Regions:
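Macromolecular interaction modules
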Residues: 1-112
């Protein structure tokens, strides 16, 4: 089962509270309600705790490089991609794009 991650920041013009309401009311129920999604969770990165290596290079950033990470468990990647190509899928992505910085990326990974 593929796992997708969206790694992103909000646009400077967007407020976190408005985005959180959008997630709760629209995005999370919308994705969880699709036949190809088995799970969808989003995490907000709060702060940098410390280095993750014994000999870090340079100074630690004061803020996390990304504000959010979304994890989407996909049961049928072809069905998801097909949905994203429809008008409804394009509108779904467009509604999310209102909030997200244009450097947002999707990655696909698997558990190690």
């Amino acid at each position: 089962m593929p796992t997708l991650f969206a790694i992103y920041n909000l646009k400077d013009t967007q407020k976190a509270e408005e985005y959180h309401n959008y997630l709760i009311q629209t995005k999370i129920p919308g994705i969880r309600g699709t036949p190809w999604c088995t799970d969808f969770k989003t995490w907000k990165m709060d702060k940098v705790l410390g280095p993750a290596v014994s000999e870090p290079e340079g100074e630690l950033p004061s803020e996390p490089p990304h504000q959010y990470i979304a994890k989407i468990e996909v049961s049928d990647l072809d069905a998801m991609l097909s949905f994203l190509g429809t008008n409804a899928g394009k509108e779904f992505v467009k509604s999310w794009s209102v909030y997200l910085d244009p450097t947002t990326i999707f990655t696909i990974g698997n558990e190690v």
